Amino acid sequence: MNTRYVKSFFLLLFFLSFFGTMASLFYSEIMHFKPCVLCWYQRIFLYPIPIILLIGLLKKDLNSIFYVVFLSSIGLIIAFYHYIIQLTQSKSVVCEIGTNSCAKIEVEYLGFITLPLMSSVCFALIFGIGLKLIIKSKKLKQNQHVYN
């Protein structure tokens, strides 16, 4: 794996997380969807990822990918849990009375693609690509300043 390959995957991860963040903001700020508690938790784990990746790109430090993989793994679990709640229309132990219901489906494409599923896919891609970078980079160097 060469340094250009690493930089390309870093950029891919950055754009994935950046567009995920922008999509989240679009639905809440432009479309005026009120995020539920689980949506907020997903945002907590998604929003720092593009910032961490940008700093990693600028400092040419691959170690930032560890934080990205950690954040995306937790975000993936929350997003998948949220999707299951929407599929089964069950109550969440996290959602409070008087707040937006976590089972409420705001957007649905093709009969099954909801916002938590889109979030799950985004987190899964970030997690998978990040994990691949970690595994492959061990062969290139000791995870320090991998690319120029």
Curated annotation (Swiss-Prot):
It holds the Pfam family DsbB. It is found in: Host membrane. Its main location: host cell. GO terms for molecular function: protein-disulfide reductase activity. Keywords: Chaperone, Disulfide bond, Electron transport, Host membrane, Membrane, Oxidoreductase, Redox-active center, Transmembrane, Transmembrane helix, Transport. SUPFAM superfamilies: DsbB-like. GO terms for biological process: protein folding. The keyword Transmembrane applies. InterPro entries: DiS_bond_form_DsbB/BdbC, Disulphide_bond_form_BdbC, DsbB-like_sf. This is Disulfide bond formation protein B. The gene is bdbB.
